[in-house]
Amino acid sequence: MTEYTPMIKQYLEIKDKYQDAFLFFRLGDFYEMFFEDALNASQILEITLTGREGGTKEKIPMCGVPYHSASGYIDTLIEKGYKVAICEQVEDPKTTKGMVKREVVQLISPGTVMDERGLKAKENNYIASLYCYEGKEYGFAYSDLSTGELKSTVIEASEDRLINELTTLSTRELIVSASEKEVLSDVMKEQLGLTFSVHEEDTIPLENEKLVTRHMSLSEKRAIGKLLHYLKETQKRDLGHLQQAVHYETSNYMKMDYYSKRNLELAESIRGKGRQGTLLWLLDNTQTAMGGRMLKQWIDRPLIDRNKIIERQNDVSELMANFFERLELVENLKNVYDLERLAGRVAYGNVNARDLIQLRNSLYQIPRIRATLLSMNSKSLTELANQLDPCEELTEKLEEAIMDSAPISIREGGIIKDGYNSQLDTYRDASRNGKTWIAELERKERELTGIKTMKVGFNRVFGYYIEVTRANTHLLPEGRYERKQTLTNAERYITPELKEKEKLILDAEEKSMELEYQLFTEVRELVKDYIERLQKLAKSVSEIDCLQSFADISEKNHFIRPTLSEDGSLHVKQGRHPVVEKVMGAQSYVANDCDLDRNREILLITGPNMSGKSTYMRQVALTAICAQVGCFVPAEEATLPIFDQIFTRIGAADDLIAGQSTFMVEMLEARNAIVHATKDSLILFDEIGRGTATYDGMALAQAIIEYIHENVHAKTLFSTHYHELTDLEKELHGLQNIHVSAVEENGKVVFLHKIKEGPADKSYGIHVAELAELPKSLIERASRILEQLENDDKKIVITNDKQPEEIHEEVQLSMFPVEPEKKASSKETKLLKEIASMNIMQMTPMDAMNKLYELQSKIH
């Protein structure tokens, strides 16, 4: 049996409690890792792997990082989804006999990051917990430890519902019991980018009972308890900044599943996975970090409460009407610090003097923001202004205590203002007077000895000294100077007077720094008493910031205030896709109308590829979302219903994370919409059925349209390449054909991007293939096949009485190129098309002659 050294034994005992984390084990000035941790960390962090004697025949794998620069390495591990247990020496090695006691003082995980460098300013960092109650419902709680936010709800015990909540929040970590983790699918565990933490205890800690209200359900309380207990156990410190748990109902907001939000690119682009090109990117002109985080929350959860939507619209209208006041408001907001995260760092004891300066400067802005809002003489903005708490007593205390030029370090002095504490002033005077005496001593000694290069210096090892070059040492009087240090070209001395004064100066400086640190911690503790008020203030400032952002974006982009319809109708005149318009420029974008009501529930959209069908569909959805977050919308006029849900199946960026085919993903998304949609929902289906055989796809597309028409009655935009489906307009009274127009000019297709009534007459798919520069022989072959199909074309739409109007005869297409039938009309048409597509202006006379011979040979 291996007999490890005492230090390795201690390491292994602690590591056994934190098997799912990298253990940063403090040894002197380094955090060391051993065994498997060392092997893995050396690769991930790209640091040197070494070995250490530990009682085994071979050296134990070891790697380490300096403690003073460990935060960067920790951030790297956390970003990759790992956990880090910080193990510190909790005894002074100088006063301890034998092995120094060590303990884990904090477990840092993706959901518990507090260091600013590991957080994104305008993104929350959520950790969530789950409690499954009898397999019927999930208690669900989440928190952003950096801001103190704590919320909870109850959702259906469905993995889809759980995924929706987790992805809406961009959750970094999920706490579950071992049995709960067991039943979650591999998709949940491996593909959502979550760190799973197993924790069994779900009782609410006594000190946190005040955070939970009585009316919450058992499953909700257990989820909160699991979250709070985990945070208490891993953070090992006061979490007094956690706010009272707020219950929320998902039914109070517009519902959009993960796929819908992804397809609409609300907060993350499909291709770049960043904010660029998203609705959030467009609407975000917030000036504060906390305002940016609130804006994302608003976009993730649009309102369905008519009064709340109108309230936001009123505020945006008032801010737009007061241009100069809004500019002043923006300037004030620019100087407001991240109050939410500051409160969290205060609770953690991580705040420094510069944080307090920024807090003070932020509080200076509050009366100015309040005065600006009141000057607009708006009832709604006055209510917002009156919610702003300037925390005047705290502002005065910070002004009185903290120097404007305070350093980051809180243990080296220079933080507290003169006049704040009389004892500190006494120490400082002693130190300053002593340094004046030192300067005077240097002058006197030079005069006494005649050594003009003599100087008085200081270092931490020898204290104050008199330095004389070796060439001048013979000028020193004997008996008065005591040699302390010999250098290459100089000697250093002390005198009795210098030694006595040194003690007075150093004692004063040491006591000054000790007292200054004590005074700083007292001020920091005082700020703790204001945490709750600062959090409420942060929420009010964030709301004001979001509203001014809406006003600014609406004005710059010529958005208009939408009307909310009572009858469920949707009428948009000259609507635009807000993001595409921003990227392309307003002059290049083609605006379009959209009309839907109880008698016109489904728009069947046909038109060429690349013509803008998908953009048009997204445009309608984004207009609705803009309206329901309280912003104005990109249109000349707009009357919109309040949608309870939006379902989409748009684009080709299929998410095959579960190993499903494109067609299976299509059908699952279609099922989700059909099962959950109501008459107040919006459905966007783009090319449903494209993932299977033509007849299968067409049959399913028709059946889905009919089912929505007869049973769901949701507002629906359904694009298709199955032109045969346009005959459904005769069968379904609530369906209307529209198309995206295109024209042919000189044999080339020109997309007009304009929506018109009625079905499209052609697809122009082969023209799109030409634009993609497919081989010419392939294009010609496709044209011949198309001609064959068009010559044999019959309708295949099946009426609701299940009797076929006409059944398409099967066409066996040759696997090899075959010559088309010799039909004069067809040949003439082809020749005319070829002649029309010729670019005569770029032909040389010889090219033209050769082309003429080629055409003549085709005729013969």
Curated annotation (Swiss-Prot):
Protein origin, superkingdom: Bacteria
Tell me which species this is from.
Listeria monocytogenes serotype 4a (strain HCC23)
Record-listed ATP binding positions: G607, P608, N609, M610, S611, G612, K613, S614
GO CC aspect terms = cytosol
Role of this protein: This protein is involved in the repair of mismatches in DNA. It is possible that it carries out the mismatch recognition step. This protein has a weak ATPase activity.
Q: Name one GO molecular function term.
A: ATP-dependent DNA damage sensor activity
For biological process, the GO terms are:
mismatch repair
Supply the name of the protein. DNA mismatch repair protein MutS
**HAMAP family referenced in this protein's UniProt entry, alphabetically:** MutS (MF_00096)
Which SUPFAM superfamilies does the entry mention?
Answer: DNA repair protein MutS, domain I (SSF55271), DNA repair protein MutS, domain II (SSF53150), DNA repair protein MutS, domain III (SSF48334), P-loop containing nucleoside triphosphate hydrolases (SSF52540)
Write the record's keywords in alphabetical order, separated by commas: ATP-binding, DNA damage, DNA repair, DNA-binding, Nucleotide-binding
What family name appears in the similarity comment?
Belongs to the DNA mismatch repair MutS family.
PANTHER family attached here? DNA MISMATCH REPAIR PROTEIN MSH1, MITOCHONDRIAL (PTHR11361:SF34), DNA MISMATCH REPAIR PROTEIN MUTS FAMILY MEMBER (PTHR11361)
Report the coiled-coil segments: none
